[in-house]
Regions:
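Positively charged, small/polar-rich N-terminal and surface patches that mediate targeting and assembly
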Residues: 1-104
Length: 104
């Protein structure tokens, strides 16, 4: 099954580094960087707000663990967001491209 993994980053440089590494290492076929999202969350008992960058990482379900581990190695957050959403349907040619772009 194909997946989109969500990961927030503190800045564009961090998002670009993680995205580039995952694609270069063929853990992901593609990663989109959405700029300047606003996150509201609870951290250490306080409600926080930050501007962040959101990665949309296209990969395969079998690659979730290696992608998660690589993000944790590269990320500056103590607890980085790494959430996978299964792709139920999509353009077959695009999904085939994802499959063929990942090193298994």
């Amino acid at each position: 099954m194909h997946q989109v993994i969500l990961c927030t980053c503190p800045n564009e440089a961090s998002a670009t580094q993680i995205a580039t590494t995952l694609v270069e290492e063929q853990l992901a076929a593609c990663a989109n960087i959405l700029p300047k999202i606003k996150s509201v969350y609870r951290w250490q008992g306080k409600v926080e707000q930050d501007n962040e960058y959101l990665l949309l990482i296209k990969t395969l379900e079998t690659q979730f663990q290696p992608v998660k581990e690589r993000i944790q190695e590269l990320h500056s957050y103590d607890v980085p967001e790494v959430i996978a959403l299964n792709i139920q349907q999509g353009n077959k040619e695009y999904l085939d491209w994802i499959s063929n772009s990942i090193l298994l």
